[in-house]
Swiss-Prot record:
Its EC number is 7.2.2.-. The lineage of its organism: Eukaryota, Viridiplantae, Streptophyta, Embryophyta, Tracheophyta. The gene is ABCG43. This is ABC transporter G family member 43. It holds the Pfam family ABC2_membrane. GO terms for molecular function: ABC-type cadmium transporter activity; ATP binding; ATP hydrolysis activity. Disruption phenotype: No visible phenotype in standard conditions. Residues 25-44 have a biased composition (Basic and acidic residues).
Length: 1454
């Protein structure tokens, strides 16, 4: 060996190590000869390592690739310093390396290179270069690329019920004539080359086509777009390789399983994506090294081998990526989601990046990866990717919204895109030269990236014109693009594009021709392990379902108790049929929950499917297989509870045959609802259509209508209903038992026994063969449904696309923009012109300037289970530690810190938005203790997550906020003017009619949504404004617009504090003061910034060891770098302690002390009312909002009416004219069944469909409630009232259809009774749905509860078992069941006064209809008044429970 191996794995000369050893010996008084014995042992260790390496090289290639040598520390003898410096070489199985050992290996290698990623990568590269192995390179070209879309424009693009109807009709007409949609050009004849080993920065304003270009270059453009032109990788078109595996697209949308930890998420992506050609490259490397007699560094060798191990659940690549992206501190924290607390937004963005970096792709297209990151973190990540690009020959195109100068300088090439044109594509060094040739220059202390994004804007361009001798004129984007073609960089690019790429130079490993990273079997194993993990994390849900089934089983077994179940005559069969049907419906409804589970996981599945993580069928098959044990458990639970207690046929064989029937029924139900979820893909549509399918298979299942009574045109429905076969299997198994072999005395049925007589009367199979035929049919249905489910997963795309409304008149927009150009210039330049004064006029509504001081704030949460598992013994985790500060009127304060420092947490604590945890400390509002009720009235909070009602337009959202949050003293006209001015300030006036939509699915882009969030708070005219990441997700120009708005707000005397991640120099220096936090929620600076941040810089430069800031460097970035945890470790100081012992801290404490005393003459804030508007105005405003929202929600309301029409037509044709032909009790039973199904299934569809609608609005409600906008009861009233209006229309439509088609008697009282009961039923179903969402933590839990409730209501509706036959101990449930009252009301109003005579099966006598109903069903016509009152009662009860849940329960955890 050439040198000693230190604990870090680095080498040093024997001479230096010997000298150091001798010096220590003399210093410590040790015996130098004893030290030489230790040195001898080190020599022996080196010899052992060499022997092991020689043995390793003799192994076959496969075994050699799986073995490596690791050094492990051993006792070096003695008790001095050198005792710990000896190592033993151990041969290890790399393929089965323990995760802990893998992390230790990585830490040693990283420590050896002193955390310098580039040196670490160089060691990889040097090893390859040493034996002449060339890394693959990819050159991406795009030529004459055009992308366009067909769009509606103006208000015609809004998805109102009217427009949705017109679109449907237009779609049908367009099959014959051309559509009137307009062509929207997204990319316009763009050309360029993305070169390997060069970092390319893609810049451009929002909606310029950046994401579209990136998706097109990775072979994943939106299928609705028309793409023309040519895209090649190394001269090869997409048909010659798999672009999804060759390149990686990092989306700007963060889609992850919220229940998985960060490490698990990256481990899964690494496992699926595989190592590509790295294994073959490493095999060739080891072969060449062996032939050349080269011995590599054992630790580097082991690390490289560990990175190419495939199919394992844990991989060292994950640890490398975690460390490179700074995610190692949260590696074992769950990712989290909307309702589950997890990692921060910035960390989530890094997980999205890391997910793609774990794979083998060397062409990376990264879309806005810095959103939510601080500038220091962004710089570190981009620097790492730059090192990968330069050292490993990667090809990278990255778009960033606000790259600071130091990050911008890391890139080699710049692509500037605007309005679909490429304005510049070439070296970074030449781009300013290009714009100067056009007359525009970047000012000093202005970031170049910010300049580039503003100089193409009509409103911002003039300020950069520097040719004073020439009069300025607007230079359009198209003109810039033409000028670039004449510029020397553009001409060079054209020449390069004219020379085709030489395909023969393509590295064999550059382009991937293998579709997936793993074999099909390995993919299945990977997906199954992930799905099993998710099932365990959601174990509460499955336990709850089992408990729910247990309760339903208990109800069923006591409802049909064997002591009340005789089996001696034909009429006794009805109760057994009721028990079987109740069981069957319970099993079917139990499978309904699969619909929600399937749809919830689809977005993540689609992302991973499209990136070729795994074949779609492996995901589907994993879900199918993992639900088999669930079916076994639930079927076993049900039959054990019910079989013998109910008193079914006692033979053991029949017990197991019934179990088999339930098992395959459950499997069939799961397969059916999985299929519906995969096909329909929207929860609203799936719930509606799912209930319709359930209705069809139930309607034709042989219980509601027997086979002989089904109309000829519907008989196919009978034979294709899976439930018919389930019914047959259960009935044949029961009624062919020996105890039913009693002779049949009914001459009208030619069957020897009452068991067979019953089967024959229902049209069921009458032999034992019927059971096995039915089981076979159910298995067949299950297989067909599962195959179709796999096909749906494979071929269907996600529904919805991100889009906004295009202006109806582009020319008009341009003229308006031109007229505003001069005015905006004045605002930008901060002049005192009339426009600037006008822009602030809306901000001078009366308000009270207020200060906010806080002292010694601490915040704790319960210790997460993941951290407890790692050995943390504390019961609480401290997120904020002893934070003190003050925010004052007219002072703009920046709250800055690295990701996870606690910025949002502090803001939530101060704003009173925390719903969990323990808060300690003192908060004063202008000297008085803060009261949250009052504080909500005078403060605004712009949340980091932009939460808005998706079905409102931009204008409607802002008007609604102003309506409820401005004082009632502000008249309507003033309010309207104020709204217009706020919209103009944040430049939303051109988007006034744009639909807000759902993030990443439809509607506004990220930056448009951010501006809407700010506008919604600004129209409240608050005294104190909190803004959480107001510029996150915005480009430099939009961020400047927002900050100008904020500055204007501060200048009116308001108190404003903003958290901010990656401010540019000009944005950072627009702040007056800074509160800087470090990880752990501790303050390291609180004070003024000063001119050009001079005060801040002087403070840090005065700390010993802190490097001076270089000229032109961004102070925000410098500040974060010099105060980072790495800097603290290097300087061996704690910046929080430095601050706590500083004069600055003491002066801040003095300021807090001053602000803790009320100013002279200032009274504590109080308002005569809790809310700005009275209750009536709140109700009016909320009702207006809900009407607007419902009108623009066709997936819910249009589908509701379409399904009502379908339900009505199905019932009408199945029970055609039954109301006119009542001759026997069977006819009456058929009508009873029709009424029961008509009420129950459409009502249940309403209930289920409304769940996601109310759930989305509840998230918005939580924000509005925290803002103190209105009383929760006014919200409850508005949503209930609007839903009732739509339900009433639905009830009228439904009543007219089925009343006329079934043939009920046309009498006014009977018709209006029917109409009332239908409208009331729909009302209580929808109100119950709203109540469930308000009273449960998640939509998923609500959906699970629905199946329990519907099963219970079904059992006690009075149809499966009539009220007189219900055991006395359960009759209260019948009266508590709203569905039973509706069936009572409909049947009693239609027939309980009828004197018709009907025949009774099995008896020779006849009965009058009203007597039969009273004796057998318990229905009396005289009782109708009470039935009407009961419906009013249920509507009122469910409404008040909904109001209670909304008012008193809060399931949002913050």
């Amino acid at each position: 060996m050439a040198g000693e191996i230190t604990p870090s794995g680095s080498r040093r000369s024997w001479l230096s190590s010997g000298a150091a050893s001798l010096a220590r010996s003399l210093r410590d008084g040790d015996d130098p000869f004893r030290r030489s014995a230790a040195a001898s042992r080190r020599d022996a260790g080196d010899d052992e390592e060499n022997l092991r390496w020689a043995a390793l090289e003799k192994l076959p290639t496969y075994d050699r690739m799986r073995r490596g040598i690791l050094r492990k520390a051993v006792d070096g003898g003695g008790d001095g310093e050198g005792a710990g410096s000896l190592f033993k070489a151990d041969e290890v199985d790399i393929a089965n390396l323990d995760p802990r050992e893998g992390r230790e290996l990585m830490e040693r290698v990283f420590k050896a290179v002193e955390d310098d990623n580039e040196r670490f990568l160089r060691r990889f590269r040097d090893r390859l270069d040493q034996v002449g192995i060339e890394l693959p390179k990819i050159e991406v070209r795009y030529q004459h690329l055009d992308i366009e879309a067909d769009v509606h424009v103006g208000k015609r693009a809004l998805p109102t019920l009217l427009n949705a109807t017109i679109n449907t009709l237009e779609g049908l007409v367009s099959l014959f004539i051309s559509s009137n949609k307009r062509k929207l050009k997204i990319l316009n004849d763009v050309n360029g080359i993305i070169k390997p080993s060069r970092m390319t920065l893609l810049l451009g304003p929002p909606s310029s086509g950046k994401s579209t270009l990136m998706r097109a270059l990775t072979g994943k453009p939106d299928k609705n777009l028309k793409v023309s032109g040519e895209i090649t990788y190394c001269g090869h078109t997409f048909k010659e390789f798999y672009p999804e595996r060759t390149s990686a697209y990092v989306s700007q949308h963060d889609l992850h399983n919220p229940e998985m930890t960060v490490r698990e998420t990256l481990d899964f992506s690494r496992r699926c994506l595989g190592s590509g050609a790295r294994y073959d490259m490493l095999s060739e490397l080891t072969r060449r090294e062996r032939n050349a007699g080269i011995k590599p560094d054992p630790e580097i060798d082991a690390l490289m081998k560990a990175t190419v191990v495939e199919g394992k659940q844990n991989n060292i690549v994950t640890d490398l990526v975690l460390k490179a992206l700074g995610l190692d501190i949260c590696a074992d924290t769950i990712v989290g989601g909307a309702m589950i607390r997890g990692i921060s937004g910035g960390q989530k963005k890094r997980v999205t990046t890391g997910e793609m970096l774990t794979g083998p792709a060397t062409a990376l297209f990264m879309d806005e990866i810095s959103t939510g990151l601080d500038s220091s973190s962004t710089f570190q990540i981009v620097k790492y990717i730059r090192q990968v690009t330069h050292v490993m020959n990667a090809t990278v195109m990255m778009s960033l919204l606000q790259p600071p100068p130091e990050t911008y300088a890391l890139f080699d090439d710049i692509v500037l895109i605007a309005e679909g044109y490429i304005v510049y594509h070439g070296p970074r060094e030449n781009i300013l030269e290009f714009f100067e040739s056009a007359g525009f220059r970047c000012p000093e202390r202005k970031g170049v990236a910010d300049f580039l994004q503003e100089v193409t804007s009509r409103k911002d361009q003039q300020q950069y014109w520097f040719l004073e001798q020439d009069h300025y004129r607007y230079v359009s984007v198209e003109e810039f693009a033409q000028n670039f073609k004449k510029f020397h960089v553009g001409q060079k690019l054209q020449k390069e594009l004219q020379v085709p790429y030489d395909k023969s130079k393509t590295h064999p490993a550059a382009l991937t021709t293998k579709k997936y990273g793993l074999s099909s079997l390995e993919s299945l194993k990977a997906v199954m392990s992930r799905e099993w993990l998710l099932m365990k994390r959601n174990s509460f849900l499955f336990i709850f379902k089992a408990f729910q089934l247990f309760v339903l089983g208990f109800i069923t077994m006591t409802l049909f108790l064997r002591t009340k179940m005789p089996h001696e005559k034909f009429s006794d069969t009805s109760k057994y049929v009721g028990a079987l049907t109740a069981s069957l419906i319970t099993i079917m409804f139990n499978g309904f929950g699969e619909l929600q589970l399937t749809i919830d996981k689809l977005p993540i599945f689609y992302k991973q499917r499209d990136f070729l993580f795994f074949p779609a069928w492996t995901y589907g098959l994993a879900n199918i297989i993992l639900k088999v044990p669930l079916s076994l458990m639930e079927s076993s639970l049900w039959i054990v509870l019910t079989y013998y207690v109910v008193g079914f046929a006692p033979a053991a064989g029949r017990f197991f045959k019934q179990f088999l029937a339930y098992f395959w029924t459950h499997q069939m139900a799961l397969a059916l609802f999985r299929l519906l979820g995969a096909i329909l893909r929207s929860m609203v549509v799936a719930n509606t259509f799912g209930m319709f399918v359930l209705l069809l298979i139930f309607l034709f299942g042989g219980f509601l209508v027997s086979r002989k009574d089904i109309k000829p045109w519907w008989i196919w429905g009978y034979w294709t209903s899976p439930m018919m076969y389930s019914n047959n299997a259960l009935s044949v198994n029961e009624f062919l038992a020996s105890r039913w072999a009693i002779p049949n005395n009914d001459s009208s049925i030619s069957a020897p026994t009452i068991g067979k007589a019953f089967l024959q009367s229902k049209g069921y199979f009458t032999g034992e063969w019927g059971y096995w035929l039915s089981i076979g049919a159910m298995i067949g249905f299950m297989i067909v449904f599962n195959i179709l489910y796999l096909c749906a997963l494979t071929f269907l795309r996600p529904i919805g696309s991100a889009s906004t409304v295009v202006s109806d008149d582009d020319t008009k927009s341009e003229l308006e923009a031109e007229s505003n150009q001069e005015q905006m210039s004045e605002v930008i330049n901060g002049t005192n012109g009339t426009e600037n004064r006008r822009s602030q006029r809306g901000m001078v509504l009366p308000f009270q300037p207020l200060s906010l001081s806080f002292n010694h704030m601490n915040y704790y949460v319960d210790m997460p289970a993941e951290m407890k598992a790692q050995g943390f013994t504390e019961s609480r985790l401290q997120l904020l530690s002893d934070i003190s500060g003050a925010f004052r009127p007219g002072v703009l304060t920046a709250l800055v810190g690295v990701s996870g420092a606690g910025k949002t947490t502090l803001m939530d604590v101060l704003a009173g938005r925390k719903t969990s945890g323990t808060i300690e400390g003192d908060i004063k509002l202008s000297g008085y203790p803060k009261k949250q009720e009052t504080f909500a009235r005078i403060s605004g909070y712009c949340e980091q997550t932009d939460i808005h009602s998706p079905n409102l337009t931009v204008y409607e959202s802002i008007v609604y906020s102003a309506w409820l949050r401005l004082s009632s003293e502000v008249d309507k006209n003033t309010r309207k003017v104020f709204v217009e001015e706020v919209m103009s300030l944040v430049e939303l006036d051109v988007l006034r009619d744009a639909l807000v939509g759902l993030p990443g699915v439809s509607g506004l882009s990220t930056e448009q949504r951010k501006r809407l969030t700010i506008a919604v708070e600004l129209v409240a005219n608050p005294s104190i404004i909190f803004m959480d990441e107001p510029t996150s997700g915005l480009d430099a120009r939009a961020a400047a617009i927002v900050m100008r708005t904020v500055r204007n707000t501060v200048n009116t005397g308001r108190t404003v504090v903003c958290t901010i991640h990656q401010p540019s120099i000009d944005i950072f220096e627009s702040f007056d003061e800074l509160l800087l936090l470090k990880r752990g929620g501790r303050v390291i600076y609180a004070g003024q910034l000063g001119l050009h941040s001079q005060i801040l810089v002087e403070y840090f430069e005065a700390i010993p060891g802190v490097p001076k800031i270089t000229e032109g460097y961004n102070p925000a970035t410098w500040m974060l770098e010099v105060s980072s945890s790495l800097a603290e470790a290097r300087l061996d100081i704690d910046f929080a302690e430095v601050y706590a012992n500083s004069a600055l801290y003491r002066s801040n404490q003095e300021l807090i002390k001053q602000l803790s005393v009320p100013p002279p003459g200032f009274q504590d804030l109080s308002f005569p009312t809790k809310y700005s508007q009275n209750f009536l105005n709140q109700c009016v405003a909320n009702t207006w909002k809900q009407f607007q929202s419902y009108w623009k929600d066709p997936p819910y309301n249009a589908m509701r009416y379409v399904m009502t029409l379908l339900y009505g037509l199905v019932f009408g044709t199945v029970f055609w004219r039954r109301g006119k032909n009542i001759e026997s009790v069977n006819d009456l039973n058929n009508l009873l069944g029709a009424t029961y199904a008509a009420v129950f299934f459409l009502g249940a569809a309403n209930l289920l469909t409304l769940l996601p609608v109310v759930s989305v609005e509840r998230t918005v409600f939580y924000r509005e409630k925290a803002a103190g906008m209105y009383s929760p009861l006014s919200y409850a009233f508005a949503q209930g009232f609007v839903e009732f209006c739509y339900s009433a229309v639905q009830g009228v439509l439904y009543t007219i259809l089925i009343y006329s088609m079934i043939g009920y008697e046309w009498k006014a009282d009977k018709f209006f009774y029917f109409l009332f009961f239908m409208i009331a039923a729909f009302a209580y179903f929808t109100l119950f749905s709203m109540m469930l969402v308000a009273c449960t933590a998640s939509e998923m839990l609500a959906a699970v509860l629905v199946s329990f409730v519907l099963s219970s209501w079904n059992n006690f509706a009075g149809f499966i078992i009539p009220r007189p036959l219900i055991p006395v101990w359960w009759r209260w449930f019948y009266w508590a069941n709203p569905v039973s009252w509706t069936i009572y009301g409909v049947i009693a109003s239609q027939f309980a006064d009828s004197d018709r005579v009907v025949t009774v099966p099995g008896q020779s006598t006849t009965m009058v209809v009203k007597d039969f109903l009273e004796k057998n069903m318990g229905f009396k016509h005289d009782f109708l008044g009470y039935v009407v009152l009961a419906h009013f009662g249920y509507v009122i009860i469910f409404f008040f429970l909904f109001g209670y849940g909304i008012k008193c329960l809060n399931f949002q955890k913050r």
